[in-house]
Amino acid sequence: MNTRSARPDGKIQKGLFHTPFWLAPEKDIFASRAVRFKELAQEDSSGWSGYLSLLSVICEAQQAAFNRHTFPLPPLYRGQTVLPAAAEVPDGFLTVFTDLLNATDGQTNAAVTAETAKLKALTAAEATALARRILTQQTEPPDRTAEIWVQAALQVVWTAWAAQLSEDDVPTAENSDRIFCPCCGTEAVGSVILIRSDLTGFRYMHCPLCNSRWNALRAKCPTCGDAGGMRLQQVEEKSVPHLAPAYSAAHAESCESCHTYRKLYRQDKQQYADPVADDLATLGLDIAVGEAGYERGGANPFLLIGT
């Protein structure tokens, strides 16, 4: 197995107006997401708000685990990614998994409490096997409701690893292959157009596992690379009464060539838009675009279809 250090000899040459290809996750990413989930739950008038509130609690627990534990970097791989998501279950997984289950005690309803009790009863070998099935996308029907906590624990570990890297550590992807995270290889859940002073107007894809971001040209479809058939679609308030505020920033970036779409969020419309959290608060957009014949690109680890 080829590995390399976290600080290679070859550095990216950065000019005065350098636009970083890759952005490491913020150290308070889970705390910020917890606040966003709480806001979205308050804005939601349906029964879905309870699930958004649960995810806020889980994100708070993620931040606590992120702050509490140390996650030494594993050997970094050469090639298209440096921290491949399909690798073995990380050493810190069981500790974080237990932390998250314990942190939700007393903050959830009876159904969730019953589910976490089942997960707490798993042996270390059973929990590790469950995580391995989820990492390798070989889940079984009984695994579905457990995925929330497993995915949340895996996010903490991979995010902690990614936060220790710099742009120099991460391979630059070709323009034709920018739907997959160059850090861990996970497909982007969506993208965000930033309003950060030095990066205003730039589109960055967002990884749902390691929470890093990487630049992709706005003029091209991130899935097939075509630049001729891109459309931005949106659910407008005039067509849907009492539309949740999150929809103001959410767009479906659809492609007439490959008939896929991926969600994009404009921070100039909602400065706290989070591609993981806001995705779950704007599912009406997915329904509308799906009914128009487009296939979604990018999975959200917290969107459990069919459960």
Where are the regions a protein language model picked out?
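N-terminal alpha-helical interaction blocks
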Residues: 13-169
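Hydrophobic, glycine-enriched assembly/anchoring segments
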Residues: 277-307
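Cys/His-clustered metal-coordination modules, chiefly Zn-binding fingers
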Residues: 162-289
